[in-house]
């Protein structure tokens, strides 16, 4: 694969990139599901993994798409092949990022346990997902069928995430909402309806 990703500038104004990248500065970071479906993301201005690489002191990626992982390794990315529900890198990280991943999983408990095994006392975990209460999804569901991605196993909300993670000793410390569509930001709606995605930061309880 020949693709000079540096030709495409990173979209630092993107709300998801801002939320994640600001927490990566000088940190050791593990990025789960970093391929983001296909190699088309490689040169995309909103590819989270590339933004993290620009800010982190050290970055390791993990994804179950073996061919894509091999291609990205050839382009200088430190990515390993693995499953987000059953990985063991035998080390800890300052920050673990799971961007738009949790809605694809089979077993959330196994995923959280794997994350916990790679966290130290001051580590943080970032989880992002689509917002099921986004105004556009509600409108579409009202007049047509509910918009879904057929690879998704659930709709997750920050409240549900907090309840789930609390059972494993994690607490939510911050939640923000954002959209890739700029016009959403100007709508006179509560943020939980206005934006298409949510981003959460968690830490170990206690």
Model-derived regions: residue spans:
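Conserved SAM/SAH-binding beta-strand->alpha-helix loop
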Residues: 65
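A short acidic, Gly/Pro-enriched loop at the edge of an enzyme's catalytic core
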Residues: 85-96
């Amino acid at each position: 694969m020949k693709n000079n990703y540096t030709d495409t500038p990173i979209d630092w104004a993107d709300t998801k990139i801002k939320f994640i990248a600001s927490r990566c500065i000088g940190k050791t970071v593990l990025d789960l599901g970093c391929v983001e479906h296909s190699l088309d993301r490689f040169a995309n201005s909103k590819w989270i993994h590339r933004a993290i690489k620009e800010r982190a002191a050290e970055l390791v990626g993990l994804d179950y798409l073996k061919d894509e992982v091999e291609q990205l390794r050839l382009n200088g990315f430190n990515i390993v092949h693995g499953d987000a529900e059953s990985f063991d890198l035998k080390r800890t990280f300052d920050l673990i990022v799971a961007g738009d991943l949790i809605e694809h999983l089979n077993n959330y408990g196994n995923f959280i346990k794997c994350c916990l095994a790679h966290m130290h006392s001051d580590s943080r975990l970032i989880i992002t997902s689509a917002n099921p209460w986004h105004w556009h999804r509600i409108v579409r569901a009202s007049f047509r069928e509910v918009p879904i991605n057929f690879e998704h196993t659930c709709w997750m909300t920050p409240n549900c995430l907090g309840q789930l993670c609390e059972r494993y000793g994690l607490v939510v410390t911050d939640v923000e909402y954002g959209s890739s569509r700029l016009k959403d930001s100007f709508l006179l709606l509560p943020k939980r309806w206005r934006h298409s995605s949510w981003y959460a930061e968690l830490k170990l309880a206690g």
